[in-house]
């Protein structure tokens, strides 16, 4: 019995050893097959001699040689300096809305009509108007900006540059002056406080100063400022015109009135206007409580609405522009913002959208202009050969 038991155990031990050996051999074979398959697949999908990855280039630097040629400029320096503004003015001239035409319909079909007794500005103001961009952050070393020497790259254009371009183009179309001002930082205030100081100085040389934030853009390049001034009832006695802010809880002053937004300001020169802007600039130093707005949002905007507008409160001193006309934009709240910025789109939370608005406004105008030119020459440019049979002979394309 013992012998039989040992024999039986020996047989079982032998069977187990054979089984383990077979399992081990199977594992080795499986691993080899896996490695061979992995190598085959990896070399087929990821060849060893891969082409080198494309070298990432700086688009601005690469295209810096593509500056407009200066050797084709006219010999008359004065003429060449004014060539582009004159060209843009002539190009847009057939599209510009007449100043005395009371009705304007936007591209979205919105109808605006000026009351007959508000048609005051009937002639172009030209160089009496200056559009000003004021900023403390301007740097001529920063690429893709107005001050940088290399040509702009539109696909990567920053929002701030898009705003500056929009203002400059609008000024050239309508014959206004334009200035881009790099202001010094206030040592004891937020950077936006420089706007009243620069505007006050510009009012010494121009009758009207239009101050805009870089994220506020003109949506209709064909609509003159004079027409908008008529719509907003700007009179010869008006000191400034600004748009209401949005009807949100934080946008009311201490007296319960909706504050005005300083992202778009029309200022008219007069001694009283100088006094207003001086008081505005001095507000944190001379008015108790105004220093609260040195760094607290909305800075100079809150100071004006909480204090200055109540000092200059004659009937026409401060014109309140409807928020929907010159504040807000079409992007906020998924396009459902109460203020759509119909004439001046202020993109405070969508600053990156200004290049899109710039491109849209330019291409809309150019497409209409080119289309009109085609129809003007349609007898020479269009041939109706639909009644011809093939092979065609004698069509006479000249």
What are these regions (language model features)?
Residues 126-129, 174-177, 205-208, 214, ...:
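Loop/turn elements at helix/coil->beta-strand transitions in domains of secreted/extracellular proteins
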Residues 134-137, 181-184, 212-214, 243-246, ...:
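Active-site-proximal beta-strand/loop segments in catalytic clefts of secreted hydrolases
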Residues 188-277, 281-282:
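GT-A fold catalytic core of metal-dependent nucleotide-sugar glycosyltransferases
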């Amino acid at each position: 019995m013992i012998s039989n038991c040992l024999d039986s155990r020996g047989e079982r031990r032998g069977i187990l050893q054979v089984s383990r050996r077979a399992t081990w051999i199977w594992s080795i074979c499986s691993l080899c097959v896996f490695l061979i398959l992995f190598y085959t697949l990896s070399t087929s999908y990821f060849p060893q001699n891969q082409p080198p990855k494309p070298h990432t280039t700086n688009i601005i630097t690469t295209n810096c040689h593509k500056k407009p040629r200066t050797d084709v400029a006219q010999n008359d320096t004065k003429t060449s300096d004014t060539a582009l503004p004159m060209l843009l003015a002539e190009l847009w001239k057939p599209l510009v809305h007449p100043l005395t035409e009371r009705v304007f319909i936007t591209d979205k079909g919105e109808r605006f009509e000026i009351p007959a007794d508000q048609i005051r500005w009937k002639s172009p103001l030209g160089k009496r108007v200056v559009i000003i961009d004021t900023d403390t952050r301007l740097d001529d070393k920063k690429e893709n900006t107005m001050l940088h020497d290399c040509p702009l790259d539109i696909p990567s254009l920053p929002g701030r540059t898009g705003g500056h371009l929009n203002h400059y183009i609008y000024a050239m179309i309508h014959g206004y002056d334009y200035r881009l001002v790099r202001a010094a930082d206030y040592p004891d205030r937020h950077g936006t406080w420089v706007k009243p100081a620069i505007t006050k100085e510009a009012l010494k040389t121009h009758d009207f100063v239009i101050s805009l934030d870089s994220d506020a853009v003109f949506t209709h390049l064909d609509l003159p400022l004079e027409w908008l001034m008529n719509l907003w009832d700007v009179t010869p006695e008006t000191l400034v015109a600004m748009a209401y802010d949005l009807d949100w809880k934080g946008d009311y002053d201490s007296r319960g009135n909706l504050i005005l937004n300083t992202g778009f300001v029309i200022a008219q020169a007069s001694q009283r206007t100088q006094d207003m802007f001086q008081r505005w600039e001095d507000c944190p130093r001379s008015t108790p409580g105004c220093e609260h707005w040195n760094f607290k949002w909305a800075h100079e905007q809150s100071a004006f609405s909480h204090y200055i507008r109540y000092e200059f409160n004659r009937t026409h001193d401060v014109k309140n522009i409807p928020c929907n006309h010159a504040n807000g934009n079409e992007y906020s709240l998924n396009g459902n913002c109460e203020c759509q910025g119909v004439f001046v789109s202020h993109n405070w939370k969508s600053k990156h959208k200004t290049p899109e608005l710039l491109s849209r406004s330019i291409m809309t105008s150019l497409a209409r202009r080119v289309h009109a030119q085609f129809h003007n020459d349609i007898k020479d440019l269009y041939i109706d050969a639909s009644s011809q049979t093939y092979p065609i002979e004698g069509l006479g394309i000249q």
